[in-house]
């Protein structure tokens, strides 16, 4: 009673953000962050609810919005009931003497549904909704009357299968009621904040069958993003609203969906069939992109305490005939210079008060095969006929490299990747000398992984190797073609770097940033997260039966053979030309929108002089990035104290203390200078190169060679910037 007399929202936040975490820890269940479950701020909830109320009136002729008879609502991921509470409050705010009306009583207790999997928020939701009604003078009800069911939304089986602990005796009754909602009730509105979890454990046959429409026709190497829980929840809602219980093939069901979710589906290349399905199912779609990813602008705050970007999406089906393709309306906070959480909440509050027209929506023009739900302007159509670095599964167009793959994937980077060779040897010695229990406790690895790695080590079927871990950051791993603590060794591609002289190119499939700097040369095996997300590697040569052959597709070899310039060029010269293009600022800017959609493409239809100039500059860049060029520059170590103490430790500093007055501060005794802001901020992929190198070595005692590598890295970056300026003149 004491709790219920306190402010409703603060109680709910406390229970959901603190008690629920402790409860889950106690039960040893999956952590909230892994499951993607977070309390939804009220500004978000109220904006979605008010927008749906508006659309009910303007699009579905429900003049009273949620108050209208026959408007049945489901929150498919109820949590502590914030969305349903907002619906309750919306209904109450529009009714005088609300509880004297039996129809309104039925609205609360018969037309509003919720599904929740976790016990604690399920209880909190009932308490919250009960308190709202009691505060408004209605007491003739029980919390048990609410249609909120302890249930997994994605479990669509018609026969119960209870394989989890539940502190309720009437779980069977709960399940039957939820099943009735899923399979029998017609809903008009589905809303909520579904969990985001890329490693989804929801693998029921029914939901996977429904999900096939989002995967149909895809031949991408990795469609794992489509298995995220939030994607499954969206597919469930689409099916429930528009497809389930159709009387006949020609019936067009109507309704609304309103969610806040991970925003990966609006511009993910793998999500193109999902977007196509939504586009062809609804009449109108509204996408409010709130951004907030740690890969977005540095000052772009998330509306949640998470690192993935989010968006609000509203889906509307109101016409009597099948959709001919939705009108898609888009608004981006980033494009409108709205970056702080406070500003984003203010925008949402404005929409809540003034309606959807408070936003200046931009109608998108969607094209096959991608159906982007974001603003994209493709002006330079000639790019589409260039040669892709690798095979583009979406468009199946001409490509250069035959053998390529994403880089190595470890089971745990902090174990499988070490800063120096000795540290890697120490890990392997532990695997050999410690007991099973000691190893599992120290390294938190499954014992089978430890045994596999140890077997490879003792049988000499693996070896300690350098690895291109991050840009200009070569570290160490234990490599074997079989799985150990390298979960995916990518041997088919990586074998061509093992004890063999080779060059390779690291690149990405599409940029997730508003810039492109995602390519670098390599000469060793590479990490799969090289640029901060999925990264690919293509060797220049393949070693087949002791023969060294160029790693080019048959189509590109035929093109090369008949090309007036390429026919006389070596694979190295072609790589140099490619590399110069990828580092050309003008190329990066001109084709940025295309570089966000697929593997980078290269134009070989150039004049002889242009090719030769680019190949010359590209060769310099390749040698530079492999640290094979001698650089004479004023950048050097400087001592910060008169005693000139030789201190090789990288002290842990905040960025404001790390880079001061054109100096990189390594510790209280040593710095590198002069370093311009341009050098310090130089970025490859998702990493600020120098900053990231230092971050991996906080509180680490460097060798002299490691510090010399850092010094040379600064010089390499400076010269790279100079060469890029030369390229920009073309």
Predicted regions span which residues?
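Sequence-level detector for compositionally biased, low-complexity segments
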Residues: 201-206, 210, 220, 238-730
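Structural motif
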Residues: 3-11, 225-226, 565-573
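Extended hydrophobic/Leu-rich segments
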Residues: 3-4, 26, 707, 727
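A general boundary/transition motif marking the beginning of the first structured unit of a protein
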Residues: 3-7, 36, 579, 609
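SAM-dependent methyltransferase catalytic region
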Residues: 7-288
């Amino acid at each position: 009673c004491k709790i219920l007399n306190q402010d409703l929202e603060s109680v709910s936040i406390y229970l959901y953000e603190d008690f629920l975490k402790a409860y889950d820890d106690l039960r040893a269940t999956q952590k909230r962050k892994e499951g993607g479950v977070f309390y939804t701020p009220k500004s978000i909830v109220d904006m979605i609810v008010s927008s749906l109320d508006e659309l009910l009136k303007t699009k579905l002729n429900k003049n009273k919005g949620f108050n209208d008879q026959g408007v049945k609502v489901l929150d498919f991921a109820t949590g502590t009931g914030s969305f349903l509470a907002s619906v309750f409050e919306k209904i109450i705010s529009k009714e005088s003497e609300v509880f004297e009306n039996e129809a309104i009583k039925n609205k609360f207790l018969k037309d509003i549904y919720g599904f929740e999997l976790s016990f604690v928020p399920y209880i909190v939701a009932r308490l919250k909704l009960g308190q709202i009604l009691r505060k408004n003078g209605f007491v003739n009800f029980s919390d048990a009357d609410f249609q909120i069911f302890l249930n997994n939304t994605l479990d669509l089986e018609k026969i119960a299968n209870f394989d989890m602990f539940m502190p309720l005796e009437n779980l069977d009754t709960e399940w039957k009621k939820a099943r009735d909602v899923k399979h029998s009730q017609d809903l008009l509105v589905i809303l909520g904040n579904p969990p985001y979890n890329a490693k989804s454990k929801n693998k029921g046959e029914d939901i996977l069958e429904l999900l096939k429409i989002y995967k149909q026709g895809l031949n991408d190497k990795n469609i794992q993003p489509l298995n995220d829980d939030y994607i499954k929840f969206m597919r469930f809602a689409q099916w429930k609203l528009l497809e389930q219980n159709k009387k006949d093939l020609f019936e067009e069901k109507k309704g609304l969906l309103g969610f806040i979710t991970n925003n990966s589906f609006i511009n993910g290349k793998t999500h193109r069939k999902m977007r196509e399905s939504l586009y062809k199912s609804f009449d109108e779609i509204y996408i409010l992109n709130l951004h907030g990813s740690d890969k977005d602008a540095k000052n772009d705050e998330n509306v949640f305490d998470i690192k993935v970007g989010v968006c609000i999406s509203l889906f509307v089906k109101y016409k009597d005939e099948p959709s001919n393709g939705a009108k898609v309306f888009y608004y981006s906070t980033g494009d409108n210079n709205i970056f702080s959480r406070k500003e984003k909440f203010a925008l949402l509050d404005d929409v809540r008060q003034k309606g959807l027209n408070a936003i200046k929506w931009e109608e998108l023009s969607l094209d096959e095969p991608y159906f982007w739900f974001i603003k994209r302007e493709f002006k330079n159509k000639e790019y589409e006929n260039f040669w892709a670095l690798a095979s583009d599964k979406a468009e199946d167009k001409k490509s250069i490299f035959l053998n390529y793959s994403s880089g190595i994937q470890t089971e745990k980077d902090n174990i499988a990747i070490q800063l120096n060779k000795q540290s890697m040897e120490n890990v392997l010695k532990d695997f050999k000398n410690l007991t099973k229990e000691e190893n599992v406790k120290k390294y938190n690895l499954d014992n089978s992984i430890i045994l596999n790695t140890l077997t490879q080590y003792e049988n000499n079927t693996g070896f300690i190797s350098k690895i291109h871990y991050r840009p200009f950051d070569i570290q160490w791993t234990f490599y074997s073609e079989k799985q150990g603590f390298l979960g995916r060794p990518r041997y088919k591609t990586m074998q061509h770097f093992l004890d063999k002289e080779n060059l390779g190119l690291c690149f990405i499939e599409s940029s997730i940033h508003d810039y492109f700097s995602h390519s670098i040369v390599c000469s060793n095996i590479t990490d799969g997260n090289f640029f901060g997300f999925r990264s690919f590697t293509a060797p220049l040569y393949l070693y087949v039966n002791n023969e060294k052959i160029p790693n080019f597709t048959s189509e590109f070899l035929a093109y090369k053979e008949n090309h007036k310039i390429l026919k006389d060029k070596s694979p190295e010269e072609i790589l140099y030309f490619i590399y110069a293009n990828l580092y050309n600022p003008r190329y990066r800017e001109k084709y940025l929108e295309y570089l966000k959609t697929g593997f980078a493409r290269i134009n070989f239809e150039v004049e002889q002089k242009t090719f030769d100039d680019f190949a010359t500059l590209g060769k310099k860049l390749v040698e530079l990035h492999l640290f094979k060029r001698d650089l004479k520059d004023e950048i050097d170590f400087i001592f910060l104290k008169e005693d000139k103490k030789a201190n090789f430790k990288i002290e842990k500093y905040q960025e404001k203390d790390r880079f001061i007055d054109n100096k990189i501060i390594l510790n209280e005794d040593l710095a590198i200078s002069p370093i311009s802001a341009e050098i310090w901020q130089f970025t490859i992929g998702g990493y600020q190169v120098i900053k990231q190198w230092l971050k991996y070595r906080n509180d680490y005692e460097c060798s002299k060679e490691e510090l010399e590598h850092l010094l040379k890295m600064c010089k390499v970056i400076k010269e790279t910037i100079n060469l890029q300026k030369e390229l920009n003149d073309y």
